[in-house]
Amino acid sequence: MEFLGTTQTASFCGPKKGCGLQALPPAGQEPVVQECYQPFHLPGYRYLNAWRPSVFHKIATSQTIPEECSGIRRPPTILPSLRSALFCRYTPRDWDRSNDLQIRNAEASRLWASRLTGDSLRIMQDKDQLIHQMQEGTSRNLGQRLSDLGFWKSELCYELDRLLTENSSMDTLKRRLECAAEEVNCPLQVALECLYNREKRIGIDLVHDNVEKNLIREVDLLKCCQDQMRKLAKRIDFQIRDNRDAQHSLERDIEDKSSAQYIDENCFNLRSTSDSISFFHGVEKFDGTVSIPETWAKFSNDNIRHAQNMRANSIRLREEAEHLFETLSDQMWKQFTNTNLAFNARISEETDVKNKLQTQLAKILQEIFQAENTIMLLERAIVAKEYPLKMAQTMLACRTRRPNVELCRDVPQFRLVNEVFTIDDTLQTLKLRLRETQDTLQLLVMTKSRLEHELAIKANTLCIDKDKCMSMRKSFPSTPRLTGYTCSAIGSGPYANHAPRISSGPCSGSALCKGPASCGGGASCGGGASCGGHAPCGSALCSHSVSRSGPGFAPVC
């Protein structure tokens, strides 16, 4: 039954679409005769606006009744106040359906609660097992970490002990070098000629390399044995500083590892029942680490390698000093050997660079060939694309002569315009790529020219070092021990710090050289010089007048 003033949210006020029920009646209940309930509406009633006055909104609508309910007589259209009885709101079937629905909902809720309880118990067991496994894994990882810490700490301590021993040896050697003073003399004519030839190098190859340093060291007679010892002592002092720096790095690393080992041991011994545990909220969100296991191990390994390199350098310096302490001939042979080794290394470097330049030149030539082919293909492609553009533009031009309304912007017109724009854009792209390829070709040509120039420079340098210098140095005395001059006066007096001046030509002054050959700094001054004839001719202690000759390398006595 329909009441005035009720809203459409009530379940008994809505229209029912059908009378047939899909659900079967409960067991043991007599079948109920199907009936169709159609709510009664007063004239002027609006279904969606039941709260509005119906007298202002009269709509001529017809109540649609399903076919199965067409046999049911519609209640007479009378006012509710004139009715003798009211219609019931629900049917017995609705009541049974509601009860069944409540029972099913209760059963579903019970099943859901039972399932949720089982799942919760299973989740708790799984999480307990997971946490236990994670704790075991963490303890195992901490144990492995402690093992790694112990290993690296022992390695660092071992290397530190060896480095301390090496530092002590270096300090002793430094004191020995500061007290030693010897002078050596070696033949210089070959080294001077090598320097003169190496001045003919061109461009960037005119570099002050290791060969140049060794040759100058030979020309200057290593200045003097005392300066040589002082330089070596200075190098040893620098090496001692490097060793101490490596020592401090090892000590700092050992100290850090000791602290980390103490902390990790405390963490390893913690248990869930320990008294020292507490909450630290947000600690897992803050990542204050500065390394990973690989970089952590590499840091200690680098410190050990650095200390080993420092010890190796110290050993080389001590060996060099021990050789320097032997004899003048040994020192001269060593210098000659070092110079030859520097020559061989430099020749190897020059050959390697020359081969690399030749390889690059071959690649550049190949790229030039490819660039030229690309330019040719691009030009052909541009020419080939011009014909479709001409055809499309011709078709557009012809279509512009259509009369009157036939001049329509139809699909062919759009396609032709699009085709023209596309082909034109393609042509612009190809032309741009053509210009870029041409620029690249110019760059490749310039690179080819530079490489050819560099190859010429390298060939000239290789010819000087290998064919001229090394061929002359083959005639250098090969005996490991050569006699020389030792002057006890060198190292004291006003000429102690002066570089020796070596002759490169025949004697032309008043000095009496012992022989017709070039003085070369190896002949003794036999004239009335202040040195008394004991100093090398042309040296700092020789008082004879000198004159410049040659390319400016050394004076002539």
Curated annotation (Swiss-Prot):
Q: List GO terms (cellular component aspect).
A: axonemal A tubule inner sheath; sperm flagellum
What is the annotated tissue distribution of the protein whose record heads this document? Strongly expressed in germ cells of the testis (at protein level). Expressed in spermatozoa. Also detected in brain.
Null mutant phenotype reads: Male mice are fertile but show lower fraction of motile sperm cells due to a significant proportion of cells with deformed flagella.
Q: Where is this region: 6 X 6 AA approximate tandem repeats of C-[GSK]-G-[GSPH]-A-[SLP]?
A: 507-541
Q: Where in the cell is it found?
A: Cytoplasm, Cytoskeleton, Flagellum axoneme
User: One of this protein's GO BP terms?
Assistant: flagellated sperm motility
Coiled-coil portions: 302-386
Q: How is it modified after translation?
A: Ubiquitinated, leading to its degradation. Deubiquitinated by USP16, promoting its stability.
Q: What is its main location?
A: cytoplasm
The segments carrying the sequence repeats are: 507-512, 513-518, 519-524, 525-530, 531-536, 537-541
Q: Which UniProt keywords apply?
A: Cell projection, Cilium, Coiled coil, Cytoplasm, Cytoskeleton, Flagellum, Repeat, Ubl conjugation
User: Per the similarity annotation, which family is this?
Assistant: Belongs to the tektin family.
Q: Describe the function of this protein.
A: Sperm-specific microtubule inner protein (MIP) part of the dynein-decorated doublet microtubules (DMTs) in flagellar axoneme. Forms an extensive interaction network in different conformations that reinforces the helix bundle composed by other tektin proteins (TEKT1 to TEKT4) and MIPs to anchor the tektin bundle onto the tubulin wall of A-tubule of the sperm flagellum.
* Subunit structure and binding partners: Microtubule inner protein component of sperm flagellar doublet microtubules. Interacts with TEKT3.
Q: Which PANTHER family match?
A: TEKTIN, TEKTIN-5
> Which named protein is this?
Tektin-5
Give the source species. Answer: Mus musculus
